Amino acid sequence: MADTLERVTKIIVDRLGVDEADVKLEASFKEDLGADSLDVVELVMELEDEFDMEISDEDAEKIATVGDAVNYIQNQQ
């Protein structure tokens, strides 16, 4: 899980320009990290590329926090 979290954190920091310390499992992309809808779509696309997977639109809508993203990726691998 640590490797997945590190990779997800790097993508979030690069995409949203937030401090790495703010990227916690419970952090919401929109409320806590300041992402808008387009940012979230782009994050999902980057996660798909990074982890060589496809995330359906239905599943993407359920990914609201950093922890949601990490858990989803872990469960798909």
Swiss-Prot record:
Residues 2-77 form the Carrier domain. Pathway: Lipid metabolism; fatty acid biosynthesis. PROSITE patterns: CARRIER, PHOSPHOPANTETHEINE. Disulfide bonds: none annotated. The keyword Cytoplasm applies. Signal peptide: none annotated. The modification O-(pantetheine 4'-phosphoryl)serine is found at residue 37. It comes from the Bacteria. It is found in: Cytoplasm. Keywords: Cytoplasm, Fatty acid biosynthesis, Fatty acid metabolism, Lipid biosynthesis, Lipid metabolism, Phosphopantetheine, Phosphoprotein. One of its GO terms (biological process) is lipid A biosynthetic process. Gene3D superfamilies: ACP-like. GO terms for molecular function: acyl binding; acyl carrier activity. 4'-phosphopantetheine is transferred from CoA to a specific serine of apo-ACP by AcpS. This modification is essential for activity because fatty acids are bound in thioester linkage to the sulfhydryl of the prosthetic group. GO terms for cellular component: cytosol; membrane. PANTHER family: ACYL CARRIER PROTEIN (PTHR20863), CARRIER DOMAIN-CONTAINING PROTEIN (PTHR20863:SF76). Belongs to the acyl carrier protein (ACP) family. Carrier of the growing fatty acid chain in fatty acid biosynthesis. NCBIfam families: acyl_carrier, PRK00982.1-2, PRK00982.1-3, PRK00982.1-4, PRK00982.1-5. This is Acyl carrier protein.
